[in-house]
Amino acid sequence: MAGNIFGQMFRIATWGESHGRAVGVVVDGLPAGLPFSEADIQKELDRRRPGQSEVSTPRSEADRVEILSGIFEGMSTGTPISMLVWNSDARSSSYDVIKNTPRPGHADFSYMARYGIRDHRGGGRSSARETIGRVAGGALAKLLLSRYGVRIAGHVLELGGIRAKPLSFEEILENVEKTPVRCADLEAAEKMLEKVATLRQEGDSVGGIVELIVKGVPAGLGEPVFDRLDADLSKALMSIPAVKGFEIGAGFEAARMRGSEMNDPFRMEQGEITCSKNNAGGILGGISTGLDIICRAAVKPTPSIGKVQQTVDLTTRENTEISIRGRHDPTIPPRMVPVAEAMVALVLSDHMLRSGFINPRTLLE
């Protein structure tokens, strides 16, 4: 299976399966001289960890990270950094009943069609548990970006048709962790919680939209034409399990606008070139403009639901029915926020190294 490595100069390779012994990541390309510790990684993993609230799976995992290489006396050495998290609460027997019946909305059938074999225990490699490696690698990318004034804020913009009101970057940072749904509009968050609770009782699930806002990205970041910054952000977010759509700036609303409405007029402000609005989402021609990068990912409802669904028996080749039991998230967006932030951080770190905005030698000065 190829496709487990992401990035060019700042690269990650994730490994492991949902019910295997462990999951992890190898980070390659982090410059020498960046101070970090397991606590820096753990802080991000704790945000993604299951079993923390009524909107996440009851699977109980400590998700304690172990750093195996690439660090000496609390500082990166420039060599590959390997990180590991042990799986401790996998209940593989719960999946025996679906061994021969692909779950609607899951990758069971497509993995079998592609490889002729699949790990049916929790989805194996296609499980969202793979994203632990992304979050661990993204934690290092965030630390690197913070040295250059780049900050990322992710939040649940919409859940089950309930949309948050517009909030400032600082308001999002202040409020996003105050509620299990990670919606910075606390009034909308209460309605979202009620929606999730109702659907969970019905044996159903709900999707939503995760929004990412990035401040401090310099103008001139990106590599046209096939390595456009927005194209790489799209790939990064679309690679997350359950993401079915991506937009940046005005996004799909741009298709309904006139040019006079869509265009962002340039102007001088305190001696700097800026724009009076930001429909482009901080990127023009695949290159950053210096304005905030604003993008969103559409997340489908959790496919594992208690309702009876149609499927087929792979052994008998006959139609049958399936009802998913076990421990599953009733909604994905809240736990996806730190994953999405990590992927954005990985893209930006990679591009800043490629474009020369980060000089690997200066970290040691």
From Swiss-Prot:
It catalyses: 5-O-(1-carboxyvinyl)-3-phosphoshikimate = chorismate + phosphate. It comes from Methanosarcina acetivorans (strain ATCC 35395 / DSM 2834 / JCM 12185 / C2A). The keyword NADP applies. PROSITE patterns: CHORISMATE_SYNTHASE_1 (PS00787), CHORISMATE_SYNTHASE_2 (PS00788), CHORISMATE_SYNTHASE_3 (PS00789). It comes from the Archaea. This reaction introduces a second double bond into the aromatic ring system. Its EC number is 4.2.3.5. Keywords: Amino-acid biosynthesis, Aromatic amino acid biosynthesis, FAD, Flavoprotein, FMN, Lyase, NADP. NADP(+) binds at R48. This is Chorismate synthase. CDD domains: Chorismate_synthase. InterPro entries: Chorismate_synth, Chorismate_synth_AroC_sf, Chorismate_synthase_CS. The keyword Amino-acid biosynthesis applies. Reduced FMN (FMNH(2)). Its cofactor is FMNH2. Residues 41-62 are annotated as: Disordered. One of its GO terms (molecular function) is FMN binding.
